[in-house]
Amino acid sequence: MTDFVQLIGIEKHFGGIAALKSVDFTVKSGEVHALIGENGAGKSTLMGVLSGNVIPTAGTISVEGCVRRFSTPGDAIAAGIAMIHQELVLAPDLTVAENIFMNRMPRLIDWAKLRRDAAQILDRLGFEIDPGATIGDLPLAQRQIVEIAKALSLNARLIIFDEPTAVLGPSDARRLLNLIRSLRSEGVAIVYISHRLDEVADIADRVTVLNDGSLIATRAAKDVTIEEMVRLMVGRPISALFGEKRTSPFGAEIFRVESLTAGPLVQDLSFGVRAGEIVGLGGLIGSGRTETARAIFGADKRESGRIFIDGSQVKIRDPRDAVKAGIGLVPEDRRGQGVVIDASIRINTTMTSLRRFSPAGIIKRTFERRFVGEKIAALKVKSAGIDAPVQSLSGGNQQKVVIGKWVDVASKVIILDEPTRGVDVGAKSEIYAIIRRLADEGRAVLLISSDHQELFGLCDRVLVMGRGRIRSELLPGEFDEERLLSASLAIEPIQTTVRTDQNPAG
């Protein structure tokens, strides 16, 4: 394979800050080259240079051996380079065909030909999508395919994928990865950016690691393990990310649900969590884990079942009742449900606890600002200040704000649904430390995650769900990915009780 693109000695300075420090990066035709690193490592800036969105301070760009200068994205597109952004750039009110050929349609449009041309590109990708469908009516996975079709319509010979599977379920993610393999076999060069290192190991031919704007290493993917990728990214092994598990005994059971039923995906569930215990909910997508969390929190209506806090039954009809009972929920969709994305860090952090700052109905701003400042410092939120909008933060820092608003409100129980989805390895480590601290303070923690390493690394027990029921309960000595997957596909449910013989110190 020959080099399609060479970036040599790329530097980029923003004011006095060096975002890229003499980085070399090459991509060959017909290869998938993964680019990994923590948030702030320089990945976005480097790809901004390659896609024409960022003009480098120094360095050269060569395409097929010819030195090029990219001043605009149009320059990169003309050279055969396109980028699929994590936040898709599509017009929701236009059709699939119109989006694919946007800004390139003649004044007199032959609509039938436009749809035929769009269908031809979509057929090449192996997806049946109606060219006349409105983008806003399509599921996210199909919109992503339209974005790829748009890149191919531009005769792109190098496509940059930025976190392409971050919001996709396992099935759609597999289809997308297979599509990328197909593009590779056609000779298309691929740059693949992802925090999902298992995908990187699965699909990449080469891996480049950036840290603090510097090139750390470029390796053949077959020669580097996920453990080594993490060590190169953050300077420590993956096992160190989870911290030390509890060694002291758990407290009494402070949270219990009995015979909880809420639709087909929550069927007759009974389980408990002790003070200081982190209990995982594992299973496949669609097994009922998120629905269980929402039913407990009062976000979805329950058909039957009882909830107990400290041995006393509590009535939870809506999230307000849950908060009063000392239960907090960090939702799966942090941008859509966890934060007000356009509001400030201050507003988001205090929205669940305004009463503590307004005893007479008037908010004490000085007290509020001091509280928020201390909170974001404790959570290590990296920001321009408490009045910065949440949307200006990285995914990991947004998630810390979501967790932060529940830290004081969720005095008894905190439920975390996919708390590290879409965040980098360094931010994951900090979120894990927060979760451990919540447990060490005596809260009952219920952790939902599709990341099996996360479940096994953090949890004291894992309840495995499948088709709305608890299928198995795994203790640390039983933590095994094959066992978890087998249990999630099992037919017979179990009724779990807290295993009093299982204790860190016992």
From Swiss-Prot:
Topology relative to the membrane: Peripheral membrane protein
Q: Does the keyword ATP-binding apply?
A: yes
Could you say which enzyme class this protein belongs to?
translocase
Residues of the ABC transporter domain: 5-237, 249-492
- Annotated function: Part of the ABC transporter complex RbsABC involved in ribose import. Responsible for energy coupling to the transport system.
Cysteines joined through disulfide linkages: none
Q: Name one GO molecular function term.
A: ATP hydrolysis activity
What this protein catalyses is:
D-ribose(out) + ATP + H2O = D-ribose(in) + ADP + phosphate + H(+)
Supply the EC number(s): 7.5.2.7
Q: Which GO terms describe its cellular component?
A: plasma membrane
UniProt keyword ATP-binding, yes or no:
yes
Per UniProt, the keywords (alphabetical) are: ATP-binding, Cell inner membrane, Cell membrane, Membrane, Nucleotide-binding, Repeat, Sugar transport, Translocase, Transport
Q: Can you name this protein? A: Ribose import ATP-binding protein RbsA
- UniProt-annotated location(s): Cell inner membrane
Native species: Chelativorans sp. (strain BNC1)
By sequence similarity, the record places it as follows: Belongs to the ABC transporter superfamily. Ribose importer (TC 3.A.1.2.1) family.
Query: Where along the chain is ATP bound?
Result: 37-44
